[in-house]
């Protein structure tokens, strides 16, 4: 059973260590308000070490937090710090510019959060399942390439260049555009996804000599509308903490950061409506590459448009109270900005 004094000692050690990166000794704790003798404080520190909440370094008689110590602090002792006025002003100014689509706002949010913390930030917009397909066009670029433009009612515009199979003619592409506009435009994306697996293959068999090639093209083009895009800010900040200077590990982390599916999996399933802000520390992140780091994940909700996620990946020695307060404020500011944008669109 941890005593109230031991809790205070643990709290002060973590706050000092996250500020300075230096082990904390009994003298510093006395200066910070622990009203006990040096011997009593050392005994409490030893007890906390035996509980697995503190660790001793070889170079100092002071202590540093363990992973379990950070977890105990986050669960029982953390008190969020209010965001400073200049940081709040900076957030609002960054969101104050003109945006042309929702993804611009989501992308900007990752950049802002990364700049505010010097950590790696992630931002995932409101769920894809809430959207409808509202527009589809194909613009020929040359004989073998076409630009596909996909629009949804949530202000998202996807465009990408696709290679056209040799067996597919320009007449086939015109017919394909007509089918998409007749059968799919105006439908929720979940309905579009279902029809791509059921009704559309039968239609393609009716109209095309090579339905497999057309089906692959359908899948490739419309698949982009279903992707949950994770925007990352400050990728290179990972090199400043947590990553051992091992070239193979650096390659693995870089590859991981380019994998949208992996990043989506990393962000999903942690924060909930009941617990909208969640810290995962070390091995709790569930990825061996990130076991020396901490991650804070937060959900935000835009009324009528679903939920999104923001996250920060940083060192285990991050200032948890400050980061919690910042992320909590940021998620509300982002939700407000997205809500304003949707109202501007009339959605």
Curated annotation (Swiss-Prot):
Pfam families: HrcA
InterPro entries: GAF-like_dom_sf (IPR029016), HrcA (IPR002571), HrcA_C (IPR021153), WH-like_DNA-bd_sf (IPR036388), WH_DNA-bd_sf (IPR036390), WHTH_transcript_rep_HrcA_IDD (IPR023120)
Keywords for this protein: Repressor, Stress response, Transcription, Transcription regulation
Gene Ontology biological process terms in this record: negative regulation of DNA-templated transcription
Superkingdom of origin organism: Bacteria
GO MF terms held by the record: DNA binding
NCBIfam families for the chain: hrcA (TIGR00331)
Record HAMAP family: HrcA
Role, per record: Negative regulator of class I heat shock genes (grpE-dnaK-dnaJ and groELS operons). Prevents heat-shock induction of these operons.
Family statement drawn from the similarity comment of this UniProt entry: Belongs to the HrcA family.
Record protein name field: Heat-inducible transcription repressor HrcA
Species of the source: Enterococcus faecalis (strain ATCC 700802 / V583)
UniProt lineage: Bacteria, Bacillati, Bacillota, Bacilli, Lactobacillales
Gene: hrcA
């Amino acid at each position: 059973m941890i005593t109230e004094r031991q809790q205070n000692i643990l709290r002060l050690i973590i706050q000092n260590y996250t500020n300075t990166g230096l082990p904390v000794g009994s003298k510093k704790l006395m200066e910070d308000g622990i009203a006990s003798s040096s011997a009593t404080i050392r005994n409490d520190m030893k007890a906390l070490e035996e509980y697995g909440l503190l660790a001793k370094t070889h170079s100092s008689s002071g202590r540093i937090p363990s992973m379990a110590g950070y977890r105990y602090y986050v669960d029982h002792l953390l008190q969020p710090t209010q965001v400073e006025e200049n940081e709040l002003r900076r957030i609002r100014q960054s969101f104050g510019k003109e945006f042309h689509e929702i993804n611009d706002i989501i992308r900007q949010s990752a950049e802002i959060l990364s700049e505010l913390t010097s950590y790696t930030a992630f931002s995932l917009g409101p769920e894809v399942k809430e959207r409808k397909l509202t527009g589809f066009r194909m613009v020929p670029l040359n004989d073998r390439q076409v630009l596909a433009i996909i629009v949804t009612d949530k202000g998202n515009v996807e465009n990408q260049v696709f290679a056209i199979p040799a067996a597919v003619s320009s007449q086939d592409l015109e017919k394909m555009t007509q089918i998409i506009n007749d059968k799919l435009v105006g439908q929720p994306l979940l309905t579009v996804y279902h029809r791509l697996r059921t009704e559309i293959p039968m239609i393609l068999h009716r109209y095309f000599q090579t339905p497999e090639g057309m089906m692959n093209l359908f899948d490739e083009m419309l698949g982009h509308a279903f992707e949950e895009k994770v925007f990352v800010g400050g990728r290179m900040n990972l090199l400043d903490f947590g990553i051992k200077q091992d070239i193979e590990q650096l390659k693995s982390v870089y590859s991981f950061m380019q994998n949208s599916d992996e990043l989506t999996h990393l962000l999903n399933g942690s924060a909930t409506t009941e617990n909208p802000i969640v810290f995962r520390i070390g091995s709790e992140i569930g990825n061996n590459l990130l076991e020396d780091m901490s991650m804070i994940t937060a959900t935000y909700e835009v009324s009528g448009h679903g939920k999104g996620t923001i996250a920060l990946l940083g060192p285990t020695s991050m200032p948890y109270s400050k980061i919690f307060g910042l992320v909590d404020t940021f998620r509300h500011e982002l939700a407000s900005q997205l809500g304003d944008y949707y109202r501007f669109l009339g959605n």
